[in-house]
Design a protein with these regions (language model features):
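Short acidic-hydrophobic, aromatic-tinged amphipathic segments that line or gate anion-handling sites
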Residues: 2-12, 93
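Classical nucleotidyltransferase
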Residues: 103-210, 290-294
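Residue-level signal for inorganic ion chemistry
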Residues: 31, 84, 123, 183, ...
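Active-site-proximal cofactor/substrate-binding loop regions of enzyme domains
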Residues: 51-117
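Phosphate/ribose-recognition catalytic cores of enzymes acting on nucleotide-derived substrates
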Residues: 199-310
Length: 310
């Protein structure tokens, strides 16, 4: 039986998790570039018989400093932790990123947090890792402090995708442009949203296609349109195929962006249930129709395309 990762919300970790390998970063989406980092860390774990830990921040610093940056995340914290557990890390530190923490000087971060509290043997970071007040700290500074605090910095070469660095920023860009397949290739899986089903206006039900309205919270917003999806309920491993509309429902003049999911061969109450919606394929852009009958005809065409999607 595989032991589940220990989750910490501060730097007061148990002694068994000190002198470990620590990977530091946001790890939003945990894409192929991140996975390359974890694969290398596992080689070090095997070679030196060490545990692997992850230090990540919540909310992501970029979202903390820009409170207008509402739709940014590729994955929720829950999804991130679940994926880290699947990578079989030994522990995860989800440090709350707040005003006090943002003001910590870079040298204090190295001395007090890394040097005294975590005491890692190896620190894995990307080349552009910044830390400390006003992002004053960088990887060069970490390396200069190696001897003083007994750790070694590992900075792997980034993974390239079509001659560009495989990054969370690149994935967001692909999603926003409607290039779902490229985003999924860097993620090495289908991009997904995990959210709670909310009670809506039941417009889908009135026109013959009942939908579950998902709260998208602060997820990055992909290109508005219709998508082939598959859906999983919390705690279940089986998926249901479906179709989703992400957008403003221009036929009904909606002001708030919505994620509406219609499941094939399903009947039941999903209100207040948590669903994971995987985006498989982009079908078409959102469009305003002259009347409900035109919309209904188009939905039938969309359904056929979604059902054929593997």
């Amino acid at each position: 039986m595989v032991k589940s990762a220990k989750i910490y919300k501060n730097f007061n970790i148990e002694s068994r998790h000190k002198n470990s390998i620590i990977l530091i970063g946001n790890f939003d989406g945990i894409h192929l570039g991140h996975q390359k980092l974890f694969l290398l860390a596992k080689n070090y774990k095997k070679k030196y018989s060490l545990k692997i830990g992850v230090l990540t921040f919540e909310p992501m610093p970029k979202m903390f400093f820009n409170n207008k940056l509402k739709n940014f995340r590729i994955s929720s914290l829950e999804q991130k932790i679940d994926f880290l557990k699947s990578l079989k890390v030994d522990f995860v530190i989800t440090k709350k990123f707040d005003k006090n923490f943002s003001k910590i000087k870079s040298q204090i971060f190295i001395k007090e947090i890394l040097g005294k509290k975590l005491r890692p043997k190896f620190i894995f970071v990307s080349d552009n890792f910044k830390y400390g007040n006003k992002r004053e700290g960088n990887v060069k500074q970490l390396i200069k402090s190696e001897t003083s605090f007994g750790y070694k910095v590992i900075k792997p070469q980034p993974l390239l995708f079509n001659k560009k660095i495989a990054s969370s920023s690149l994935i967001r860009n692909f999603l926003q442009k409607g290039e779902l397949e490229k985003a999924n290739r860097i993620l090495d899986r289908k991009w997904s949203i995990h959210g709670k089903v909310q009670r809506g206006k039941q417009l889908g039900k009135k026109i013959g296609f009942p939908t579950a309205n998902i709260d998208i919270k602060d997820y990055v917003l992909p290109s508005p349109g219709v998508y082939a999806v598959r859906v999983k309920k919390l705690g279940r491993n089986n998926y249901l195929k479906g179709i989703a509309n992400l957008g403003f429902r221009p036929t009904f003049i909606e002001k708030k962006i919505l994620l509406e999911v219609h499941l094939f061969n399903f009947s039941g109450n999903l209100y207040n249930k948590y669903l994971t919606v995987e985006f498989k394929k982009f079908i078409r852009k959102e469009k305003k129709f002259k009347n409900v009958n035109q919309l209904r005809k188009q939905i039938k065409i969309d359904l056929l395309k979604a059902k054929k999607t593997k």
